[in-house]
Amino acid sequence: MNTFGDNFRVTTWGESHGKALGAVIDGCPANLPISEQDIQNELNRRRPGYSIFSTPRKEEDKVEILSGIFEGKTTGTPISGLVFNKGQKSKDYSKIKDTPRPGHADLNYFLKYGNYDYRGGGRSSGRTTIGNVIGGAVAKKLIEFTHNIKIIGYSTKIGKIKGDFDYYKNPKFFESDSNIEKLLKKIENNPLRCPSKNSDEMKDYVIDAMDKKDSVGGIIEIIIKGIPQGVGNPVFNKLEGKLGSAFIGINAVKGFEIGRGFEASELYGSEMNDAYHIYENSIKEMTNNAGGIIGGISTGSPVVLRVSIKPTPSISKIQDSMNLISNKDEKIEIGGRHDPIIVPRVIPVLESMAAITVADLMISSGYINPCRI
């Protein structure tokens, strides 16, 4: 439905062209230092207008916290935050309200519910991820404050152009906090949030698609660094199962893999297995091909995840569809303001869902006191 999590729960609400969107976070312990600006900083990363490759829709996305935070700290009660929509242009959709847009949820929503908000996709719009990011901002703060866990997201592939930077090209890079700080700055200073040296080639690829009135997708890598051993459970409450559920809940996501992922099918067992050794009186893995999770439980190594993002379905090209009133085939030309690539703006959303998942399981696994910090 609209709530994710068991102990740390985030409920999102709102539609693309409604009055407002937001989230209610229940289960955050008291005494967590956090400000409205902390949440705003994360929303700014998701906000439209981030780069030349994002929608020209103008939105301030200013968050208002209504409850749950007092004198700069959480109170342990539900945290409620909202963002008012200000830049919606619903008239852009009035001409196509009876013609389902290919690649969107319009037709499925109509067939299932009968009555749905067609403006900008309503509840199925990417804009509804504002609620995810509000919840994720709180979760990020919680896991970093209590266990210094950091979540780093970046694009590794745009369309058919593969980047030259990812975790497995240099795993030791992520052992250094200074390296990570430099990486984060590099990511945020790139319009595609891509740290690869060939990111200019990726930019040209997107521009070419824009010139053709088309769109492109890509692959995002998410690294969770600092998560302790023992987070997650066997069988139906696995860490990777929860992360997969969190990510697949985002409409743009079409694929998900952990560690070596599908590449593991090509390896010998001797190549895939992460051997152990004793280092400074602790058991350490010599490699991290499993991606930080074995048996549904975190190993203590960085969790390595990759997510496939589909091309933005709203494109300016004329497409085939049908009319729900006349029940006849019809051409559709989508107006409005849309992202030629959604990948860079999905990154903070994926980071948010990863943080919510980790916070939830760390509370259930006993790593975080559910009452107070």
Curated annotation (Swiss-Prot):
Q: Name one Pfam family in it.
A: Chorismate_synt
Residues binding NADP(+): 46
- UniProt GO MF annotations: chorismate synthase activity; FMN binding
What GO terms in the biological process aspect are recorded for it? amino acid biosynthetic process; aromatic amino acid family biosynthetic process; chorismate biosynthetic process
Transmembrane region(s): none
The free-text cofactor remark is:
Reduced FMN (FMNH(2)).
What HAMAP family does this protein's entry cite? Chorismate_synth
Query: Does the keyword section mention Flavoprotein?
Result: yes
Metabolic or biological pathway, per its Swiss-Prot or TrEMBL entry: Metabolic intermediate biosynthesis; chorismate biosynthesis; chorismate from D-erythrose 4-phosphate and phosphoenolpyruvate: step 7/7
Q: Which PROSITE patterns match?
A: CHORISMATE_SYNTHASE_1, CHORISMATE_SYNTHASE_2
Which cofactors, if any, are listed as required?
FMNH2
Q: Which reaction does it catalyse?
A: 5-O-(1-carboxyvinyl)-3-phosphoshikimate = chorismate + phosphate
Family affiliation: Belongs to the chorismate synthase family.
This one is known as Chorismate synthase
Gene source species:
Methanococcus maripaludis (strain C7 / ATCC BAA-1331)
Stated EC number for the protein is: 4.2.3.5
Q: Which PANTHER family match?
A: CHORISMATE SYNTHASE
**Superkingdom, natural source:** Archaea
Q: What GO cellular component term, any one, is given?
A: cytosol
Q: Which residues of this UniProt protein bind FMN?
A: 123-125, 251-252, 295, 310-314, 337
What function does the entry list? This reaction introduces a second double bond into the aromatic ring system.
Q: Which UniProt keywords apply?
A: Amino-acid biosynthesis, Aromatic amino acid biosynthesis, FAD, Flavoprotein, FMN, Lyase, NADP
